[in-house]
From Swiss-Prot:
The organism of origin for this protein: Helicobacter pylori (strain P12)
Compartments it resides in: Cytoplasm
Catalyzed chemical reaction(s): a fatty acyl-[ACP] + phosphate = an acyl phosphate + holo-[ACP]
Enzyme Commission (EC) number: 2.3.1.274
Listed InterPro entries: FA_synthesis, Phospholipid_synth_PlsX-like
Protein name as annotated: Phosphate acyltransferase
């Protein structure tokens, strides 16, 4: 299995990415292709690691402040070169660089799976249960039609079933209330269409994401990104409050010591690094979009995530789902119109 790793554009430079690749290679068998500035990377690559990876040199990359559309023009940029390697035989790509550039190039260079109108970013959210919830779209599509959300539901269902091994995933539609009549026009129209599918649970509220009420939560990219950023902010704020209170007295420090294991589990469940990255679903190869602030652990987990996606053949599963399941939407709509 060959995995392409974009070294450029992350907030903390190349070091955490190289460390993450090194750790993953200690635990999994795969071929790593590093794309980026060789001069910046070489000081951090040991002789042992150098023997296990292939290095493709380029100094160009799409900066965060640049428009995503720059990517298609910059054929020597790290993400363009990486996407070409993926298109021409590699199995997966991971990038912690410009997410818009990654999404745009993946769509243009790899192509969409037949039947998919818009690819979506799929992210894992912590829940009170033993397994996380899947949220999509987490930011790829700000403005959506109901048909796009149907695509997201199908892709999220297949990802949960194939990659996460959830037996019969339940899919919920994010709304401002669980009643069928709640929601804006987009939610109401999507709800009607999703009723055609056995996996559809119904509307869910924001709090249900973390209760594990459903396995997959579907929404437009604007709402999904707000949910994601709010979750990150709340988790960070709670962590800071805990630290301040623990340091406030000797009694608090002793109590924290007794709860060390519980705090460790809480941190693991709420730490974005443990989830790796966010798969871009709907394109013809596995692409993982990692957080710009990714540390070595996040890159390591993103690689494991990519390996799971490839081994589970999730792109093929989504293709098959669109061939067999999506036509039922048009049938359902026709039935409604006839009625």
């Amino acid at each position: 299995m060959k995995i392409v790793i974009d070294l450029m554009g992350a907030d903390h430079g190349v070091l955490p990415i190289i460390e993450g690749v090194s750790r993953a290679l200690e635990n999994k068998s795969f071929s790593a292709v590093l794309v980026g500035d060789k001069d910046k990377a070489t000081p951090f690559i040991s002789k042992e690691l150098a023997s296990k990876v292939e290095m493709i040199h380029t100094q160009d990359y799409i900066k965060m402040e640049e428009a995503a559309t720059e990517a298609i023009k910059r054929k020597e940029s790290s993400i363009y070169l990486g996407m070409d390697i993926l298109k021409n035989g590699a199995d997966a790509l991971i990038s912690a660089g410009h997410s818009g550039a990654t999404m745009g190039l993946a769509t243009l260079r790899l192509g969409r799976i037949k039947g998919v109108e818009r690819p979506a970013i799929c992210t894992l959210m912590p829940s009170v249960g033993k397994r996380p919830s899947v949220l999509l779209d987490a930011g790829a599509n700000t403005d959506c039609k109901p048909e796009y959300l149907i695509d997201f539901a199908l892709m999220g269902y297949e990802y949960a079933k194939s990659v996460l091994h959830y037996d019969i995933p339940k899919v919920g539609l994010l709304s401002n209330g669980e009643e069928d009549i709640k929601g804006n026009m987009l939610v109401k129209e999507t709800h009607k269409m999703l009723k055609a599918y056995d996996f559809f649970y119904g509307n869910v509220e924001g709090s249900d994401i973390f209760k594990g009420v459903v396995d997959v939560v579907v929404c437009d990219g604007f709402m999904g990104n707000v949910v994601l950023k709010t979750t990150e902010g709340v988790a960070s704020a709670i962590g800071s409050i805990f630290k301040d209170e623990i340091k406030s007295s000797f009694k608090s420090k002793m109590g924290a010591l007794m709860l060390k294991n519980a705090f460790g589990i809480l941190k693991q469940k709420t730490d974005y690094a443990e989830y790796g990255g966010a798969p871009l679903l709907g394109v013809n190869k596995s692409v993982i979009i990692s957080h710009g602030k990714s540390n070595a652990r996040a890159i390591e987990c993103a690689i494991y995530q990519a390996i799971s996606a490839v081994e589970s053949q999730v792109c093929l599963r989504i293709t098959q789902a669109f061939e067999s399941l999506k036509p039922s939407v048009s049938v359902h709509q026709s039935d409604q119109q006839d009625a």
